[in-house]
Regions:
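Active-site beta3 strand of CheY-like receiver
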Residues: 53-59
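Acidic catalytic/metal-coordinating carboxylates
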Residues: 21, 41-45, 63, 68-72
Length: 181
């Protein structure tokens, strides 16, 4: 089996921040940490970037002109390919209200500025490892060929295997009800 090039093995990080000095600091630190960095200076640009490439992790400033980080996070989470990509807020907003809002909008972590690049890279690596484990577990369940799903307490399906999706589609088909499965 051919070995992947160094570039192919690098984690891809999308950094979304409107401050050039923060973008420069983070780009230098993340690239030195062996990661590939994509940059966006606002929420709309971030949404354009992810339409072309799905990053492994997203670093997102909360305070930006136009669409703020909280709105951007919610818009990113609404896209199925990004549902499991870790989004980490990095901002000067340290009030409990803002931290809670960051998590409520879909963030998995919240780092306050000034940012310590070494601590940030350690956090990124932890979130990346967790995301990989989750992806592997889901892939294994999908490959098992069984009808499995995860639902919220109110009954909304959060995740399902392809076999479960087939059954759910058949159950909601107007020509074939659940009694026809």
């Amino acid at each position: 089996m051919p070995e992947l090039s160094d570039a192919a093995q690098r984690d891809v990080v999308l950094v979304v921040d409107d401050a050039p000095e923060t973008l420069s600091l983070l780009t230098d630190a993340l690239e030195a940490g062996g990661m590939t960095v994509l940059v966006a200076t606002d929420g709309a640009t971030a949404l354009q970037r992810v339409s072309r490439i799905i990053p492994d992790v997203i670093l997102l400033d909360a305070v930006m002109p136009g669409m703020d980080g909280f709105e951007t996070c919610a818009a990113l989470r609404a896209q199925p390919p990004l549902a499991q990509v870790p989004i980490i807020f990095m901002t000067g907003l340290a009030d409990t209200e803002h931290v809670v809002r960051g998590f409520d909008s879909g963030g998995v972590d919240y780092v306050t500025k000034p940012i310590d690049p070494d601590v940030l890279i350690a956090r990124l690596r932890t979130h990346l490892a967790n995301a990989r484990r989750m992806f592997s577990a889901r892939a294994a369940l999908d490959a098992a060929g069984r009808a499995l799903l995860s639902a919220t307490p109110d009954g909304r399906v959060q995740w399902s295997t392809p076999k479960a999706q087939t059954f759910m589609a058949a159950a909601t088909d107007t020509d074939r009800g659940p009694d026809k499965l």
